[in-house]
């Protein structure tokens, strides 16, 4: 793509814009594009540290300035993300379409909120994101902006510029001598945070292609994992992991430790084709090692402490919450309502769990809770003196009464 072909008419009316900046392919191209597109516009780069790792943050400030930003604000959101967004979400049992633990989705509201806060701080009149016009994230970001700062103009370059592919972006950056770690042969779209990393694009766009070993970055291949299992002991209070192997840890540090331990055993990989909010299907490979262990631990205690109807209610809350988070509707009354409804149930999730990690599997092998409704004395198949089995007869007659009446009517 030549400079002449990529030229655009200068727009006025935006004096200062805060860009959600990652230093990746898309946002690296956006800074020069904004300067070329908007007349006399100051670009402020904003980067959310959500636990994506030091490698992604290293040199980010310098790169943003070299690309044309006047400032770069790097905001540490790691602990807040885990404590105030991830834990409340997984405590509802939210899991999208049965497999996806919502790693990208849960991070978007806190990033958008922090971006708005930076925009207010610097007096910006616009915010900008690098989300594709085909994806979910454009809806998530702009839904949050609408709820938090409806007065700010939103700039979405993927819906405006003439570039249509990541290959176009590579050419655009090469023409301007702006460095990027992406290449034509390694062109996955990745998004990482403390909870997970996602991989999309490139060879993965064909669901008949098995992901190569080079796709995965957070977990070892299960077949290459240790031949001996590892056991991890977790303590939970009100739906939160408070100790790992007896060590008290903050929510973020507990997750980091579990990521390391579970990732070494190949735990947390999924390869799915999901229904996007915008109507199309997309394929994603996700790695959520620590989160997979945490989710299993929560469900294990839940099995002990929730009665049947409470668990059915939690499942309804979890399904609705998963769609709400996936669809970018965190800052809504419905989200507050779902979180409020799930809290009395989450408060019961106290106890201890031992998880066995082996060759890609995280299996709960021990669990106990002070709130447990399970009683060995009642459930035993051996002799007991607490349960009169004759009591079941009257219960069964009442429980099956409607079926009995229907059958009698059919015999007439």
Curated annotation (Swiss-Prot):
InterPro entries: Arginosuc_syn_C, Arginosuc_syn_N, Arginosuc_synth, Arginosuc_synth_CS, Arginosuc_synth_type_1_subfam, AS_cat/multimer_dom_body, Rossmann-like_a/b/a_fold. SUPFAM superfamilies: Adenine nucleotide alpha hydrolases-like, Argininosuccinate synthetase, C-terminal domain. PROSITE patterns: ARGININOSUCCIN_SYN_1 (PS00564), ARGININOSUCCIN_SYN_2 (PS00565). It is found in: Cytoplasm. Disulfide bonds: none annotated. Pathway: Amino-acid biosynthesis; L-arginine biosynthesis; L-arginine from L-ornithine and carbamoyl phosphate: step 2/3. ATP binds at residues 20-28, 48, 130. GO terms for molecular function: argininosuccinate synthase activity; ATP binding. L-citrulline binds at residues 100, 105, 136, 140, 189, 198, 274, 286. GO terms for biological process: argininosuccinate metabolic process; L-arginine biosynthetic process; urea cycle. Coiled coil: none annotated. It is an enzyme of class 6 (ligase). PANTHER family: ARGININOSUCCINATE SYNTHASE. Homotetramer. Belongs to the argininosuccinate synthase family. Type 1 subfamily. This is Argininosuccinate synthase. It comes from Shewanella halifaxensis (strain HAW-EB4).
